[in-house]
Regions:
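Short loop/edge segments at beta-strand edges and connector loops
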Residues: 66, 82, 136, 178, ...
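Acidic, Mg2+-coordinating active-site environments of NTP-dependent enzymes
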Residues: 7-9, 70-75, 169, 184, ...
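Non-catalytic positions within long, well-ordered alpha-helices that form the structural scaffold/packing
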Residues: 53-58, 167, 189, 363
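N-terminal leader/targeting and accessory segments in enzymes
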Residues: 1-90, 94, 226, 238, ...
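ATP-dependent carboxylate-amine ligase
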Residues: 1-14, 35-38, 248, 285, ...
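Short glycine-rich anion-binding loops that position phosphate/pyrophosphate groups of nucleotides
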Residues: 44-45, 70, 180-181, 202-205, ...
């Protein structure tokens, strides 16, 4: 296709060459350039794509999209843009024929609840007869195709490629998780979401490799409400007024607040042997009783979010309730049967907010003991380690501190940081570096009435050590332990 058609919704300056140039494909990885490619020079945190200009020209690139002037032969067209990541989103959308305009698009952001809510929405809409694509932390789902995820929110080119494949597969709509990094790096530019959902916000993802401070984190998250037609926001969030500041969408709210458009009232814990759940009554825009077999107040918020979205798709009460019963997410309060005496679950809680919410919720079910096993990721904020240690020390009867993804740090050094937070409490703890050994300890020392939580890994099926990912699925580890391996 001609370059001019790829640039039709973008501000740019043509430094040399012709915008009538034919483009074979759009590339942002210099290793994939071929004859006739358009190459986008991305200025990354580690590598600057501009330095690969001589290489991609040698491979046959005919168009360069740049943020600064570069030297290139006369037969190479050079397009100057203010931000090449932003430009890539619009170029990619044009390249794939603006597929988002053929779908109902639902974007969900927030510190927690994104993953569970996306699967709830998918379950409800599919139960009502819609064909739904999904993009998220765990995977992308396009028809019968499942693609393991590398990032919560992929690069803009990949998003548009997925959208295109969803249209080809006959999807009506797509629900996707939208990370603060994805918003900050313009991965979701090039289209406007039909629905943008903001679940909550608490300090997280703050550090040298992520956001400089909470204000930056909040600012990036709230960009979604400037990139959607209808915004659906948690009215109970303490930062609500800042979240909606400058929004350009029509706004709806949900929560327990009397001011919320969709409200939960009369919440109750429900449970039995191997079953932990919650029920509530829905009021406001809809009026019916809801029961979910996922414990905790956050399950109410997740289901409220999903219901608030699906209301716009005219889904019946019957379909909503039926779908919520079967909506399950790998690694999100995932019950694993190991004994009739105690309950064991796997959960992705990997920051203090999520861990506190999870443990506080489970405390409400009055276990004999609440046992929390977790570690923290290497090459990430130390503050997270202190905070998680303190949270577990306060809320768990026993904490088993172990390894998560140590990456390039020594596992014991990470554990030592966690114990700094533990020391602020009277909580009992043991240190077991090897995660399989730690899980075995938890199972073999389980007592009747215990609730045991394996926190942090969730859906992940690997452990990252010194730059390499080794296979490690907690479900497999548990099966091996029970088999005596």
């Amino acid at each position: 296709m001609k370059l001019i058609s790829l640039l039709e919704r973008l501000e740019y300056t043509c430094l040399q060459g012709s915008t009538e140039q034919e483009v074979k494909n759009v590339i942002y990885d210099s290793r994939k350039v071929e004859e006739g490619s358009l190459f986008i020079c991305i200025r990354g945190a580690v590598v600057d794509g501009h330095k690969f200009v001589p290489d991609v020209i040698a491979k046959g690139a005919k168009v360069l999209v740049v943020e600064e002037a570069v030297e290139a032969p006369e037969d190479v067209t050079v397009i100057l843009v203010k931000d090449s990541r932003y430009a890539m989103a619009f170029i990619s959308a044009a390249y794939f024929g603006y597929p988002a305009e053929k779908l109902k698009t639902i974007g969900i952001t927030g510190t927690k609840g994104k993953t569970t809510t996306t699967y709830m929405v998918k379950s409800i809409l599919e139960n009502a007869g819609y064909k739904v694509g999904l993009i998220g932390t765990i995977e992308a789902i396009i028809g019968d195709k499942v693609i393991p995820a590398k990032n919560t929110t992929p690069e803009s080119y990949v998003i548009q490629e997925y959208f295109h494949e969803m249209v080809e597969a006959g999807c009506d709509c797509v629900v996707m998780e939208v990370s603060s990094q994805g918003l900050m790096l313009h991965r979701t530019q090039g289209f406007i979401f039909d629905f943008g959902i903001f679940t909550n916000i608490e300090p997280d993802h703050i550090g040298p490799n992520e956001h400089k401070d909470f204000d930056d984190y909040l600012r990036c998250k709230s960009l979604l409400l400037k990139q959607c037609k209808v915004g659906i926001v948690n009215r109970d969030d303490e930062h609500f007024d800042r979240i909606i500041e400058g929004h350009t969408c029509s706004l709806e709210t949900y929560g327990f607040s009397p001011e919320a458009d969709l409200r939960a009232e009369d919440a109750k814990l429900v449970g039995g042997k191997g079953y932990l759940g919650i029920s509530y009554h829905l009021k406001g825009l809809l009026d019916f009783h809801v029961e979910i077999d996922i414990p905790g107040k956050f399950s109410i918020y997740n289901s409220l979010t999903a219901i608030a979205i699906c209301r716009h798709f005219k889904v019946s009460e019957e379909n909503i309730l039926k779908a919520l019963k079967v909506a399950k997410v790998k690694g999100r309060i995932e019950m694993v049967k190991v004994s009739d005496d105690f309950t064991l679950m796997i959960d992705y809680a990997h920051n203090a907010m999520a861990l506190e919410s999870l443990l506080s919720t489970l405390r409400e079910y009055h276990p004999h003991r609440l046992v929390c096993l977790f570690g923290c990721g290497g090459n990430r904020s130390k503050i997270r380690r202190y905070e998680m240690g303190e949270v577990s020390g306060k809320l768990a009867d026993l904490t088993i501190i172990t390894s998560d993804n140590p990456r390039n740090e020594e596992p014991q050094a990470i554990i030592d940081d966690i114990t700094v937070g533990m020391a602020k409490t009277d909580g009992k703890y043991v240190e077991i570096i090897d995660r399989k050994e730690a899980i075995a300890y938890a199972i073999h020392h389980g007592e009747p009435g215990d609730i045991i939580v394996l926190a942090g890994k969730g859906h992940e099926d690997y452990q990252e050590i010194k730059g390499k990912k080794y296979p490690m699925d907690e479900r497999v580890l548990i099966a091996d332990i029970l088999a005596g391996k």
